[in-house]
């Protein structure tokens, strides 16, 4: 298990015994989240496994598959834990695929208010059936609330445009600027943001930029070691 505290321009830590604050935590979510106190999380931004045996075709990605991405048996237990740790007015952003959006809406909606489906429009298309299907150019983000909290800065359109990354650090890497936007809309400085499937740690990088505290879990040690360098401003390859 790799748990490393990062030095840098982080948010001011909140008072109280909240474990894993502003640390890289190499641990499965279902073990780590048990240590997170009730009603301690201001915002959830996470990209869970889609349950579709994702396989990257990107030639520079060394870890091409995603651990535990072969089923969604864990989904409701995960949502129950999110309900426990989230504050009463917390927002949640959960990345989804069209393959599983109905299931996610059903299970997440049993515990939270599903407010909208945001569309992340990418600058170029993904892989797939090059002759018999339309080229994928978007991902879905389930926007949920644990209460009636308002968005910062008013109401924006639900189509979000952001360039996709090169996916060199993780096969489903998310742009830091996209995560930063979501964080700014739904949290304030020094709030605590939770990401239970950290991957490339885009959420942690965005939190560092926007002066939020983060709690991030990632089961793959290689991604955690890469994140240690990314959060210090030095990018390295996976090993």
Predicted stretch roles:
Residues 223-239:
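Cysteine-dependent PTP/DSP-like catalytic domain, specifically the C-terminal lobe
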